Amino acid sequence: MLPRRDPRDRTSRLRLVRSFFKTDEREEGGPIRSPFVVGLGNPGRSYGRTRHNAGYLVVDELAKRHDGSWRKRKKAEAAPVSLGLTNATLLKPTTFMNNTGSALSDHRPENLIVVHDDLDLEAGTVRVKVGGGAGGHNGLRSIIGRLGNDFVRVRIGIGRPPA
């Protein structure tokens, strides 16, 4: 687990995200506990490749690229992977979006990196953020309701549908 710190200090979380993309030595500060990378989406074939399942699509691609195999858990599918110098567990909650928080209630927010779709970002845009509100996203609202908002989010822009 990451050490407790001032909630306004986002440095350790952002260092955790950057560690995924490093292939050389880790930054000073000691080992970081293996994070859970959570892809938000809805289970079932009818939702499989919809834009709102962008989180599922990202963790599926990470599992494919890093030889992860999905295993069923109580309320999620999990795939342990090695990402650069960091081991992580990819998670796909098997609850519907509005109940995602119940699938993550056993996890500490500081160990989560939540990947989700964002209507307000242009399609293909990616932003990393720590903390904040739900922004109208029901999956985030559910997680925040259970765990608070102190977790890393990777926002995947899907844009608004044409009017």
Language model features with spans:
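Nucleotide and nucleotide-moiety/phosphate-recognizing core
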Residues: 2-131, 140-154, 161-162
